[in-house]
Amino acid sequence: MSLNSLDLPGKPEDTRVVVAMSGGVDSSVVAGILKREGYDVVGVTLQLYDHGAAVHRAGSCCAGQDIEDARRVSESLGIPHYVLDYEARFREAVIDPFANSYVSGETPIPCVSCNQTVKFADLLQTARDLGADALATGHYIRSRANGAHRALYRPVDTDRDQSYFLFATTQEQIDYLRFPLGHLPKAQVREIAEEMGLTVAKKQDSQDICFVPQGKYSDIISKLKPEAANPGDIVHIDGRTLGRHDGIVHYTVGQRRGIGVATGEPLYVVHLDAANARVIVGPREALETHKVFLRDINWLGDAPISDLPEGGMEVFAKVRSTRPPRPAVLRHADGQTWVELVDGESGIAPGQACVLYSDESNTARVFGGGFIGRSEREPQAEEMLRRLVANTASASAA
């Protein structure tokens, strides 16, 4: 049997596709394209978090106005549209872990957790319950057949590449998901929206983190976890106490501005010692990292990660969403998985993701990745930090 444009058997009219509609231009165009191709399209919008009934905030996702936009687009396309209340689930699976992670001194990525749990787990099950053959989203990433399964690849438009946030997508989810925009540049998507007469054609893009008002992480974390705002010392990596801070929630590894001390030398946050409420700062070279150890790994390679050769596997690693993939070596031994960064990176923080690729091009395959549990700096800085933390632990025990 021949395959349709979604690589599924059967004619489009016999293929039901649930489209995850956020109310933005991307998911709206996905619904429009699939409807135009003759698929049996069903739109579903998740109500995840709202700062006020039907109050739109630029950069939010799935708030009141966004839900109304998704409804209007669905109506104009002539497809059924359902709104599912996932606020409690979103709080449990995304917001609370986000706050807990910050309290422990990490720099979490809530969008990964949202995709991993709510969007690609709960919503996927909803799509199956609706009898859908696939779940389509407006993410900028590509998938294509790889033997009996499907593999992920970077999109054509690398400026919109969302593979960093989708590394935790499981093989089962990848096989069921479809990403119709992966081969299109964003500008063309807007043009298609205009051609279709969609009301959201000129709508501003979301900024992903829907539950953080005006981008102030500290506000919501302080409300959920007041202990994150406990004051403490700002300490130089060489052991000098330089000043005080109003809570580690206001800092992140790699930060330079707004540290709150003036010493005549450029200082950066190099470590958040959550156990002792300390912000540890140092020179830029103290941020340089060449090795990161991963946890909660989602490996999407063809062979098990435990079968990596003794010398490791040459890959390209991305340690921040805004940075390009850089040469690295992936290693696995004695139950540990780590990545050696050939050129080193600065500002790497626990809780961030390290995503692995076959190469640095926009056709690169996504091999998955993991969350950064810890990292190792240049030997001198690493030893200074270990000594500082160890001495504090010994003093506390005494």
Swiss-Prot record:
Site residues by UniProt (Interaction with tRNA): 139, 352
Family named by the database record: Belongs to the MnmA/TRMU family.
Organism of this sequence: Brucella anthropi (strain ATCC 49188 / DSM 6882 / CCUG 24695 / JCM 21032 / LMG 3331 / NBRC 15819 / NCTC 12168 / Alc 37)
Subcellular localization(s) per the UniProt record: Cytoplasm
EC code(s) of this entry: 2.8.1.13
Name of the molecule in the record: tRNA-specific 2-thiouridylase MnmA
Swiss-Prot/TrEMBL catalytic activity: S-sulfanyl-L-cysteinyl-[protein] + uridine(34) in tRNA + AH2 + ATP = 2-thiouridine(34) in tRNA + L-cysteinyl-[protein] + A + AMP + diphosphate + H(+)
Record Gene3D superfamilies: Adenine nucleotide alpha hydrolases-like domains, HUPs, Translation factors
Taxonomic superkingdom: Bacteria
Main subcellular location: cytoplasm
Function: Catalyzes the 2-thiolation of uridine at the wobble position (U34) of tRNA, leading to the formation of s(2)U34.
Disulfide bonds: 114-210
Keyword terms, alphabetized: ATP-binding, Cytoplasm, Disulfide bond, Nucleotide-binding, RNA-binding, Transferase, tRNA processing, tRNA-binding
Taxonomic classification: Bacteria, Pseudomonadati, Pseudomonadota, Alphaproteobacteria, Hyphomicrobiales
PANTHER family per record: MITOCHONDRIAL TRNA-SPECIFIC 2-THIOURIDYLASE 1 (PTHR11933:SF5), TRNA 5-METHYLAMINOMETHYL-2-THIOURIDYLATE -METHYLTRANSFERASE (PTHR11933)
GO biological process, one term: tRNA wobble position uridine thiolation
Chain intervals for the UniProt region annotation (Interaction with tRNA): 160-162
Positions bound to ATP: 20-27, 46, 138
